[in-house]
């Protein structure tokens, strides 16, 4: 009887232990199920986040493609502006050459005027000394008149040349205004590209990439942005250089205009002297 009691107690103790182990196993199973459900939720959330990141990266890629297109357009505009600046330089060189030739003709006309004046003085002295030699005096007067006419024709030709130079300068000024407008348009496009790049950079910084492939793609896009930023800085520098070149050309045009005014005044003075000399000669 005592043995049966002991056996029953042992069986009861074993039953209690089994119940405890079963409860522990059930608790572990519940914990495992909770962890499994949590892991599944995390996996679904991670997959959703990766899909969202891929969508955002696709949008960023489209924005980068559009930015590359705008950058190419900007570079083409800058190349056009540089070509215009080179054409302006060539035109100014031609104007300077015309001005040098006109100055040479002015020197010739001035020399002939001096020669005519000297001849007129000599003619006056000869007229007083040789009043009875009218035929000789008339021939000399005719020669002086011909020289004066030739000098006047050269002065008129020089005036026409300077009018042509003035017309060319007006064309240069119009070209300069168009170049300045293109430079201003290029600057506004650069500002727009910088703003777009800033937005792209902020979007990339806000992405929380948890998958290695997405991280690699983000790094590649950031490298493209750095390259585009460097290209934009280079384009800005080229635009600034083009603007400085236009300003320099404008100063050169102003200088040439001043020289034109000065040369026209010299021509007017020579023309007045020719008219006065001719009047004095015809008065005798």
Swiss-Prot record:
One Pfam family recorded for the sequence: Tropomyosin
InterPro entries tied to this protein: Tropomyosin (IPR000533)
Coiled-coil parts of chain: 1-284
Assigned keywords, A-Z: Allergen, Coiled coil, Repeat
PROSITE patterns assigned to the protein according to its UniProt record, in alphabetical order: TROPOMYOSIN
Domain remark from Swiss-Prot or TrEMBL: The molecule is in a coiled coil structure that is formed by 2 polypeptide chains. The sequence exhibits a prominent seven-residues periodicity.
Function in brief: Tropomyosin, in association with the troponin complex, plays a central role in the calcium dependent regulation of muscle contraction.
Family membership noted in the UniProt record: Belongs to the tropomyosin family.
Assembly: Homodimer.
Name the UniProt record assigns to this protein: Tropomyosin
Organism: Dermatophagoides farinae
